[in-house]
């Protein structure tokens, strides 16, 4: 989903960068030394310089991934006043409200503007780990358009 979103942005001349947390070894947030870890410092800089951030996350146990929550804890104030959207992937349709806890936290803790067009996908939207749903592609396109419009206002 993140790669398709980046394609949507690039097709409109909007720069896009994907950061895959699987490729960024992060320490667990310990409230102390973890904040000075080189990867944390690098990601904090990237986040603080971004205007719009779209978070792509799997949903586990009715919540965003622990890796994503750890990133937010480690990079804290870099999130101040960001425009944030969500791409969520879950096994089934019943957790569609699950991202609200994280969205509320970003909104209240860091005054992020949350794009009210979440993309929520289920296993039915994929075939062989590839997007197969026209409806999902359309929802991602609408998220790209909404985030670009909000960014430019």
Language-model features and meaning:
Residues 35-110:
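Helix-loop-strand module that forms the ligand-binding subsite of alpha/beta enzymes
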Residues 18-38, 126-129:
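N-terminal beta-loop-helix "entrance" segment that forms/cooperates
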Residues 1-2, 39, 98, 139, ...:
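Hydrophobic alpha-helical membrane-association signature
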Residues 13-25, 112-121:
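Short beta-strand elements in bilobed, periplasmic/extracellular small-molecule ligand-binding domains
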Residues 7-8, 45-46, 146:
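Alpha-helical scaffold elements within enzyme catalytic domains, especially in hydrolases
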């Amino acid at each position: 989903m993140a790669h398709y979103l980046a394609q949507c942005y690039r097709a409109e001349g909007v720069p896009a960068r994907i950061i895959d947390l699987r490729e960024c070894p992060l320490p667990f947030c310990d409230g102390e030394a973890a904040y000075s870890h080189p990867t944390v410092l690098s990601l904090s800089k990237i986040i603080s310089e971004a205007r719009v951030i779209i978070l792509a996350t799997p949903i586990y146990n009715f919540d965003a991934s622990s890796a994503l929550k750890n990133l937010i804890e480690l990079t804290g104030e870099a999130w101040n006043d960001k425009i944030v959207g969500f791409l969520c992937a879950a096994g089934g349709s019943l957790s569609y409200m699950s991202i609200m806890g994280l969205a509320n936290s970003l909104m209240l803790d860091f005054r992020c503007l949350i794009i009210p067009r979440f993309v929520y996908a289920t296993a039915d939207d994929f075939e062989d780990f590839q997007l197969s749903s026209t409806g999902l592609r359309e929802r991602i396109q609408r998220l790209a358009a909404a985030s670009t419009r909000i960014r430019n206002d």
